[in-house]
Amino acid sequence: MVSQEAVVFLALSGAIAFLLPIGLIVWFKRKYGASLKVFFIGALTFFVFAQLLEGGVHVYVLQVNEMTKEAMQHPLWYGIYGCLMAGIFEECGRYLMMRFFMKRHHTWADGLAFGAGHGGLEAILITGLSSISLIVYAFAINSGTFEQLLVNGDVKQALLPIQEQLLHTPSYEWMLGGIERISAIAVQIGLSLLVLYAVKNRRPLFLLYSILLHALFNVPAVLYQRGIIEHAAAVEIIVALIAALSVYWIVKAKRVFQ
């Protein structure tokens, strides 16, 4: 049986993923006059550059090309690749969209809106939708209907690890996904302001800074995936510290854009 606590924490994580981006853009619009158009440009940027383009490269490098697939088995190469690819695609995408589609939107509030849209769609796709599917699987396990989903070998291979996760993961860990999204959105807003500064002041060197900082933010998650960091809570503590620095920059950046 999947515990009630696990289901509750999954629901809370999903709620954070869906409601936080909406709450942020409503707040930013009411208090700072942020643009809904910029919010949706930020969301589109994540979808195109992270989900489609970066995702396509990952399929080729990690699955199709045998040489790179084998090379990525080494933790060092996988770590470097994973961290840098996210930074390159998302930050270059941010720069291009701001440069060509936000020519009249270079204010501090625009940076807030873009980051909320970018990080918001990321939260919905990564944590929100997965929380919903996991809750559905949890109810199926508890009602005894999960086995009916295992119609063939491929489905079993995909679903049995999910069943193991739901049954054996400590309940509190399901809440970490929602907490991580809070930190991630803060970082995405901070990076959006950094890239917008690069665009506004024609200082592309700050794009390089954003790529490196984005890569740094991804290091704890990659180390956890490879088993170098053993506890998920440790990852979230590190990520929260990075998010706190991002919030400090977000507040200070208001003067920079005046």
Curated annotation (Swiss-Prot):
It is a multi-pass membrane protein. One of its GO terms (cellular component) is plasma membrane. Pfam families: YhfC. Keywords: Cell membrane, Membrane, Transmembrane, Transmembrane helix. It comes from the Bacteria. It is found in: Cell membrane. Its main location: membrane. This is Uncharacterized membrane protein YhfC. It comes from Bacillus subtilis (strain 168).
